[in-house]
Amino acid sequence: MSSIYTLSYDKETNQIIRTVKEIFSKNINNNKELSVLIDKYFIPQELEKKSNAEVSTPFKLRQEMLDKMPIEFWTTPKKVFEPCSGKGGFVIDIIDRFMIGLKEKIPDEKERYKIIVEDCLYFSDINPTNIFICKLLIDPYNKYNLHYNEGDTLDLVIKDKWNIDEFDAVIGNPPYNSSGNTGTGNTIWQNFTKKSLNKWLKSNGYLVFVHPPGWRKPNTEKGKYY
């Protein structure tokens, strides 16, 4: 089946690639600057918004969400899944949290970074362009064994894909529905929530999502899902 998504290697894209590689080469732990760069340059295109309800999650909101997790979470290697990675905002933020949290346990920056991206981080997206960008941001020189899925995350079986059973945390901003218009299309955010709670997440794990508030209210229709 042909994809509606294509990779466009135009002059602007090549400049972004050069910029990302330059930032990365200057400081392997410069993840906050990379994260801000995502907000500035990697904005979902109209096709991505309409076909897959893709939206950017602002840097400030991402930080507020991650701040709600215990600081201690990041002080030991754990498995974290971003199921709708988009252009990589949460992915880079997760790396940054681990880089800070694991500093005492793993003082060497390069060793720490390798452990994080190879043992702690997992991500998925339906859009191959997004996967390309995430891989570029994380590993511009193809040095690491990354764990990613290119395809519909709701069809993903993590045991088959990565030979793991559960994650310590699932973090992201799942699409609200199957189109970019909240008034049309089938709502799918609850499918990401259900699968996170029932299939992906440890019983004592953390689910950190942007979502409508209804599913937390048992007396609402959405709340009946749970």
Region annotations inferred by a language model:
Residues 1-226:
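SAM-dependent methyltransferase catalytic region
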